[in-house]
Amino acid sequence: VGRESTPPARLDDAVVMSLTPDRVDVVLRSKVDAAWHLHELTRDLDVSAFVMFSSMAGLVGSSGQANYAAANSFLDALAAHRRAHGLPAISLGWGLWDQASAMTGGLDAADLARLGREGVLALSTAEALELFDTAMIVDEPFLAPARIDLTALRAHAVAVPPMFST
């Protein structure tokens, strides 16, 4: 085994008060259980990389996606845990991609315009692949490959998260 990566995520968007344990579990299981099992199965193997696809939602939150944000935060923490134990790991907190997918298929033009006004810009596939290649040579447990318009983010945020300040 040379490299390991986690399976795709599941979504079940809702406001926090309407999330049931079952709804949270479905979303957590797709990322948390899969990543933890891969961690356990590979921690004694000589793998060259352990790559997890997280989301900016774990870093900055996302309206209606508390369960998804929690699942992604777990991946980010698992990468730090593995690195603290001398194991390879990186969690990539991806921003928005412009290519339609199961994750973005429900976004319409109005949603994309709102995200843009809030500072979240879509990555082209070429940009995302270039950022992925770069991430594979950077020695960090977590990176956030994303296009962010800091001016727009500052204009719509009560406080800019420290990660995005100068």
Annotate each predicted stretch with a short phrase:
Residues 1-166:
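4′-phosphopantetheine-dependent carrier domains
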